[in-house]
């Protein structure tokens, strides 16, 4: 499923032009996000929207190789309808004692979910991030907010890794 992103080149093309049954040739993602945290600190993964995909892959790689430090996932979604992969995260929580996740909703309140944007919620969940490695993925605005917030909580620049999604310049076709 592809969610329409405001101003998103690809998601809007899919919703407006692609017909059911049409074929696409796609290739892998080409981001710069690190694939497996080779760190010896607790890990905090922050994600919004489709930014959850790379941090889920990162967390899964770490857990599969036996990473022992705490891994916490904080996922921000507008509504419960926008939440995906919650079942997998719940399963990881039962299988890996060092994994935990929390979901925050920004446009509704619901039992079992935190409420509010990352910059408001994060200080309520963590008071000190000086010993954490941070991975943040999502829109550029989300990532910028995460970086500013974790720095206020003591995170060190060298332990902050980001993946901000942005519209890439389209090739000129002659």
Feature locations, PLM:
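Histidine-anchored nucleotide/phosphate-binding helix
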Residues: 54-64
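Reductase modules of NAD(P)H-dependent flavoproteins
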Residues: 71-174
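Short, flexible hinge/linker loops that cap or flank conserved catalytic cores
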Residues: 36-39, 65-67, 127-128
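Hydrophobic/small residue at the entry helix of a nucleotide-binding pocket
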Residues: 50-55, 142
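Short, Lys/Arg- and Gly-enriched loop/turn segments at beta-strand edges
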Residues: 9-10, 31-38
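Ferredoxin-reductase
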Residues: 1-23, 77-79, 104-108
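Short, compositionally biased
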Residues: 36-50, 153
